[in-house]
Amino acid sequence: MILLDTHIWVKWVLDEKQLPESVQRQIIEHEKDGLGVSVISCWEVAKLLELKRLNFDMDVSDWINQALSYPDIQLVELSPSIAVESTRLPGEFHRDPADQLIVATARIHDCPLLTLDRKILAYSHVKLL
C-alpha cells in the first residue's frame, strides 16, 4: 500500500489531470497494492470546505463516501500507535497536526507516502514516492 496525502487524494478524485504526470503514474503503478487514505484526510477535506478553501457540488459527507468507494482505496484508521508516533517523530518536523498524523501513519504502516508538500518532502524520516 502507498499512502496518499490529502491534496493528492482530492485532486485525483476531482480531476487527476491537476496532478503532475509523474504523480499520476505513481498512483497507477501502485493501485494494485492499495491506495491508502488516512481518516485524518477526511477531516482535512471537511475542514477545507468549512474554511471555504474547497468547494464541492455535494455535501462533504457524500463526497467523502464517494471518494472512499473508488477501487483500490483503503481507509486507514487512526490508532493509538499512530497518535503516539505523531508526537514522537524524529528530527525536525513542522507543527501541522494533520501532517504529523499522516506522516506517522506512513511510518507505522511502513508504507511510502505520495505527496507534493514541500515540508513533508524535506523530511527525511518517512518513505516517500
Predicted regions, residues:
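Short loop/helix-cap segments at secondary-structure boundaries that form the rim of catalytic
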Residues: 119-126
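A short helix-to-beta-strand connector/capping loop
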Residues: 31, 71-73, 124
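Active-site neighborhoods of divalent-metal-dependent phosphate/nucleic-acid chemistry enzymes
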Residues: 57-61, 70-116
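Short, well-structured N-terminal submotif of metal-dependent ribonuclease cores
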Residues: 1-37, 51-66, 109, 118-119
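Phosphate/NTP-binding elements of NTP-utilizing enzymes
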Residues: 45
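Residue-level signal for well-ordered alpha-helical positions
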Residues: 15-16, 48-51, 70, 89, ...
